[in-house]
Amino acid sequence: MEQYHGTTIISVRRQTPEGVQVAIGGDGQVTLGNIVVKGTARKVRKLYHGKVLAGFAGATADAFTLFERFEAKLEKHQGHLTRAAIELTKDWRTDRVLRRLEAMLAVADASASLIITGNGDVLEPEQGIVSIGSGGAYAHSAAKALLTNTELSAEEIVRKSLAIAGELCIYTNMHHTVETL
């Protein structure tokens, strides 16, 4: 799976006695080649009446196009995350314009966490951890360790994982945006 430079997006879900906690976060760095052009970008957001969390890695304009299309699919399928993701991927693979978009999405709701790629993949990683972008592997490793060995909330795990990724990945900064369900 191709990883795009310039960001880290991580989502964590944790089962607690009070219910499922879901959080997603991303850094704010935008690069153009080897130059940082913005440090405060917002790459994660809530969709579908605040019931779905989404983040992107890749070309910003492409990602916003995908967010719009994905939200339309969520509306069409009454918020069913997996169905909307599959339908978006079908369009992404078959539409001439969409096929050229260079971005990946990480999405989550109360029942599932998914990675959506332009290669036609809708992936549901194990353990409720989703990570994309150049710092994704660092954040994923940190989240896995924290999820397994601590009682931290999903939001706290996302924040700490982003901080660790920011220390290791030159394309990830320390300005983080985190959303929770």
Curated annotation (Swiss-Prot):
One of its GO terms (biological process) is proteolysis involved in protein catabolic process. One of its GO terms (molecular function) is metal ion binding. The keyword Cytoplasm applies. Protease subunit of a proteasome-like degradation complex believed to be a general protein degrading machinery. GO terms for cellular component: HslUV protease complex; proteasome core complex. It catalyses: ATP-dependent cleavage of peptide bonds with broad specificity. A double ring-shaped homohexamer of HslV is capped on each side by a ring-shaped HslU homohexamer. The assembly of the HslU/HslV complex is dependent on binding of ATP. The active site is at T7. Na(+) binds at G166, C169, T172. PANTHER family: ATP-DEPENDENT PROTEASE SUBUNIT HSLV, METALLOPROTEASE TLDD. Allosterically activated by HslU binding. It comes from the Bacteria. Belongs to the peptidase T1B family. HslV subfamily. Its EC number is 3.4.25.2. This is ATP-dependent protease subunit HslV. HAMAP family: HslV (MF_00248). Keywords: Allosteric enzyme, Cytoplasm, Hydrolase, Metal-binding, Protease, Sodium, Threonine protease.
